[in-house]
């Protein structure tokens, strides 16, 4: 069997080859929502923006499912390949693909059945609800395709073809971007046009990703590879739970934030709809930075997973530290943009009155103040997932959202009103950063001193 370059190639070259396409693919995923937001803001107004924000939890839940199965199966595959177990790798990939399809269909049915109830729970106001329902009812159709595409992208990267994974996402995003102005302005379909443009783009990405099923090189499928195995499926989910749980926590915090902003916003001069619209714009802007960090972590994972399985711990440490340095460069640029050019960024998403821009600028500067350290927690969680320590990875993934941000979002507004919702972000970011440094530092010291560590 040919030696895998993950075990001997220069780490900087590997991270570049794997992370850059992953970053592009991850950015493309976030662009689906960003592009819709910009065109809807220009064509419908800030109520349209608020509507897409209310519907956004559907996308984060979808991503959570894709990460659960995609990251889980890809991490399992990388470990199996590192241990030179090709049949086990094929079984992991096959069961992962089957799970993607099952979860996608279930998600569509549940979402459409309880759509109105869910939108109200997500914080839709009376004025926003009609737009949100129209948008979400259409975009849910594309969710099964999105789950399979995002999930298979992780397997394609694990197969050593990150550029193809990137192409799958880029094609869909280009189609979405072309169709958005046509459907919204030329066809005059409004917010429904943006939704259909998104779905069509997702279908094209799905077709390209699914075609790769017959092109895998390090994974050799047999019919038995796709036989549903409950034990194998649970293993996959356990290895993807850290990345997925972070997204689930993101969904929960979105719902809490939207409801808190409308409640406390009603007590201020901003009202209910302005905070809701501003929050979504800030979160989706930050999603671009997080997408880059996710791309770095996805590029880092197969490198760390393979070398941990091969017991080359010095390469594990080198890959993690290089990923942290990349993150620092990105977050520094983001900090400068968010603190010094917030109004220019917000203006991209459409016009609004003076109160709208006043609150949106305040939100961006305050909530994203600790963006410099935000990515460390995500990279650290992915680090533990890659070395097979799923429980520790899951716990670390939950720290910012569940252990810090959710309680702070509920408690701080009691003292500081709507400003408390904004302050919860930087406090949670810094707290999660400190915990991440402690846990990863301890693990790296263990690896440095160990001669025979096996995945737990």
Go through the PLM ranges and name each one.
Residues 61-64, 176-180, 206-210, 288, ...:
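Hydrophobic transmembrane alpha-helices of multi-pass small-molecule transporters
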Residues 49-109, 146-165, 258, 278-342, ...:
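Small-residue-rich hydrophobic transmembrane alpha-helices
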Residues 70, 139-157, 165-173, 194-207, ...:
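Short runs within selected transmembrane alpha-helices of multi-pass transporters and secretion channels
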Residues 12-31, 35, 58-65, 141, ...:
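Residue-level signal for short hydrophobic patches within transmembrane helices
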Residues 1-21, 77-142, 186-241, 304-370, ...:
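Short alpha-helical transmembrane segments in multi-pass integral membrane proteins
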Residues 31-50, 119-126, 182-189, 251-282, ...:
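Helix-terminus/linker motif at the lipid-water interface of multi-pass membrane proteins
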Residues 17-36, 138, 149, 172, ...:
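Transmembrane helical elements of multi-pass membrane transporters/channels
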Residues 20, 36, 73, 114-115, ...:
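Hydrophobic/aromatic residues in alpha-helical transmembrane segments
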């Amino acid at each position: 069997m040919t030696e895998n370059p993950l075990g001997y190639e220069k780490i900087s070259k590997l991270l570049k080859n794997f992370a850059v396409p992953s970053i592009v693919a991850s950015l493309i995923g976030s662009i689906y929502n960003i592009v819709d937001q910009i065109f809807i803001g220009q064509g419908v107004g800030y109520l349209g923006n608020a509507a897409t924000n209310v519907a956004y939890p559907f996308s984060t839940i979808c991503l959570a499912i894709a990460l659960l199965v995609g990251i889980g199966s890809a991490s399992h595959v990388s470990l199996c390949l590192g241990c030179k177990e090709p049949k086990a790798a094929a079984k992991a990939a096959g069961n992962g693909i089957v799970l993607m399809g099952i979860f996608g269909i279930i998600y569509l049915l549940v979402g459409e059945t309880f759509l109105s109830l869910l939108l109200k729970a997500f914080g839709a106001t009376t004025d926003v609800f009609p737009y949100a329902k129209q948008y979400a009812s259409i975009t849910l159709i594309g969710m099964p395709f999105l789950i399979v595409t995002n999930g298979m992208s992780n397997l394609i990267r694990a197969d050593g073809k990150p550029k193809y994974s990137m192409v799958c996402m880029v094609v869909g995003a280009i189609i979405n971007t072309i169709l958005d102005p046509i459907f919204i302005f030329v066809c005059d379909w409004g917010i429904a046009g943006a939704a259909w443009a998104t779905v069509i783009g997702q279908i094209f990405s799905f077709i390209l990703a699914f075609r790769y099923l017959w092109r895998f090189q390090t994974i050799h499928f047999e019919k038995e590879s796709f036989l549903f195995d409950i034990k194998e499926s649970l293993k996959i989910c356990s290895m993807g739970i850290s990345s997925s749980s972070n997204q689930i926590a993101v969904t929960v915090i979105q719902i809490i934030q939207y409801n808190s902003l409308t409640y406390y916003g009603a007590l201020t001069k901003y009202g209910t709809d302005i905070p809701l619209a501003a929050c979504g714009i800030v979160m989706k802007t930050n999603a671009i930075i997080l997408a880059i960090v996710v791309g770095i972590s996805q590029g880092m994972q197969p490198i760390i997973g393979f070398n941990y399985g091969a017991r080359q711990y010095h390469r594990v440490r080198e890959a993690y530290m290089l990923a942290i340095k990349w993150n620092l460069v990105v977050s520094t640029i983001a900090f400068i943009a968010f603190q010094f050019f917030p109004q220019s960024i917000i203006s991209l998403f459409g016009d609004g009155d003076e109160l709208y821009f006043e609150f949106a600028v305040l939100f961006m500067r305050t909530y994203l103040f600790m963006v410099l350290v935000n990515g460390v927690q995500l990279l650290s969680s992915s680090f533990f997932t890659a070395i097979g320590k799923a429980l520790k990875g899951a716990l670390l993934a939950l720290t910012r959202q569940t252990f810090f941000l959710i309680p702070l979002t509920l408690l701080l507004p009691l003292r500081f009103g709507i400003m408390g919702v904004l302050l919860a972000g930087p406090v949670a970011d810094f707290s999660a950063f400190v915990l991440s440094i402690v846990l990863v530092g301890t693990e790296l010291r263990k690896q440095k001193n160990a001669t025979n560590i096996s995945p737990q």
